Regions:
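Juxtamembrane/disordered regions of integral membrane proteins
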Residues: 1-150
Length: 150
């Protein structure tokens, strides 16, 4: 695993997803204000963990880098397809994790209480995140014919 490349992929992918989340309302999807949401959730835990919106955005960036590291260590060479397709598949995994862990933790409930527009916006964002992580980090998986001894 190339940690520097994974961290860079995480930063670029998180910035890409954040940019998309900011414009989603212009295409009819609900606003997903991740920085404010994480900030509110941290403040609800205790006054010690209270952070402003900038702290929420920083936490989102850190989580984005951590997930990119997980992708690099465990998923990049195990998923099928091109680096972009592997990233898209990983984006679906991250979306499911977000809906099972982060959405309930931030008060949105499991799978955003079935709000289809919110789910669509979240899935779109995570597909962008995963696609960018896969494209920026990923190398091509060697074909079986190129393997030594083939």
């Amino acid at each position: 695993m190339d940690a520097k490349r994974a961290a860079a992929a995480g930063v670029i992918a998180t910035a890409s997803m954040t940019a998309l989340l900011m414009v989603e309302p212009s295409i009819g999807l609900p606003k997903i204000a991740i920085g404010e949401t994480l900030s509110s959730s941290m403040s609800a835990i205790s006054s010690v963990t209270a952070v402003g919106p900038a702290g929420g955005w920083l936490l989102d960036l850190i989580v984005g880098v951590v997930f990119a590291m997980i992708y690099a260590a465990y998923f990049d060479q195990r998923l099928p397809g091109s680096r972009f397709v592997r990233g898209l598949l990983f984006g679906v995994v991250v979306f499911i994790v977000a809906q099972l862990i982060f959405a309930p933790a931030t008060g949105s409930g499991f799978f955003s209480h079935g709000d289809l527009e919110l789910l669509a916006g979240g899935l779109l964002g995570h597909l962008v995140y995963g696609g960018v992580v896969g494209y920026v980090y990923g190398g091509e998986v060697p074909s079986p014919a190129a393997a030594p001894g083939a």
